[in-house]
């Protein structure tokens, strides 16, 4: 089983990154958006991974923080929560935020995540209480770090962010509305990561 990959980031297309190790092997890894936003093209990265096997594919999911991977593994143990939904949950909020919402029985916070309705949220709150209570996540920073990244054309940035959100389960209209709201104050975004961060924050104000 592949548990940790160290290498140079060769390619970034949210939510997938390709990381090449010193042996010359490149691994395509899907990451929750907060982890994805910490990667930089052509820079070194250490990514904790979960190897996921389906009938039609073998996939690697990656996380900057090992505890985030622990939370992901607990999520996919729950009946009805697949890897895609777990990735969407950890894209909509950090592992620390998820644990906080579970401890506070915050049903509304979970229903903001694409694919999670009221009944599913209620069931998740019950099942996650025991699963997450022994996982110590870093709650000192609920906002993920952002650094300047190479400039891309604005149209490409918007298209990439929209595609990333849709791949995680958001509807096209929801993704477009969130992007529009993020840009409503006239701010310009020079890179995908900064627009992703601003767009994800908009979902917190929806519903």
Curated annotation (Swiss-Prot):
Gene Ontology terms, MF aspect: ATP binding; four-way junction DNA binding; four-way junction helicase activity
Region annotation (Domain II) ranges: 65-143
Pfam families xref list: HHH_5 (PF14520), RuvA_C (PF07499), RuvA_N (PF01330)
UniProt protein name: Holliday junction branch migration complex subunit RuvA
Family per similarity comment: Belongs to the RuvA family.
Keyword check for DNA repair: yes
Lineage: Bacteria, Pseudomonadati, Pseudomonadota, Gammaproteobacteria, Moraxellales
Quaternary structure, from the entry: Homotetramer. Forms an RuvA(8)-RuvB(12)-Holliday junction (HJ) complex. HJ DNA is sandwiched between 2 RuvA tetramers; dsDNA enters through RuvA and exits via RuvB. An RuvB hexamer assembles on each DNA strand where it exits the tetramer. Each RuvB hexamer is contacted by two RuvA subunits (via domain III) on 2 adjacent RuvB subunits; this complex drives branch migration. In the full resolvosome a probable DNA-RuvA(4)-RuvB(12)-RuvC(2) complex forms which resolves the HJ.
Region annotation (Domain III) ranges: 153-207
The record's note on its domains: Has three domains with a flexible linker between the domains II and III and assumes an 'L' shape. Domain III is highly mobile and contacts RuvB.
Location of region: Domain I: 1-64
């Amino acid at each position: 089983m592949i548990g940790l990959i160290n290498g140079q980031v060769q390619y970034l297309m949210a939510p997938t990154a390709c990381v090449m190790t010193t042996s010359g092997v490149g691994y395509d890894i899907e990451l929750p958006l907060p982890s994805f936003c910490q990667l930089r093209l052509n820079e070194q990265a250490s990514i904790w991974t979960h190897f996921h096997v389906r009938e039609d594919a073998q996939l690697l999911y990656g996380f900057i923080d090992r505890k985030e991977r622990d939370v992901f593994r607990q999520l996919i143990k729950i009946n009805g929560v697949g890897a895609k939904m777990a990735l969407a949950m950890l894209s909509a909020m950090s592992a620390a935020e998820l644990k906080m919402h579970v401890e506070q029985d915050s049903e509304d916070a979970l229903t903001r995540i694409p694919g999670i309705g009221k009944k599913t949220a209620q069931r998740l709150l019950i099942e996650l209480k025991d699963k997450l209570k022994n996982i110590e996540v870093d709650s000192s920073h609920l906002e993920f770090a952002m650094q300047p990244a190479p400039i891309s054309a604005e149209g490409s940035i918007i298209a990439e962010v929209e595609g990333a959100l849709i791949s995680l389960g958001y509807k096209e209209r929801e993704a477009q509305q969130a992007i529009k709201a993020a840009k409503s104050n006239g701010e310009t975004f020079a890179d995908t990561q900064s627009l992703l961060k601003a767009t994800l924050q908009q979902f917190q104000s929806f519903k």
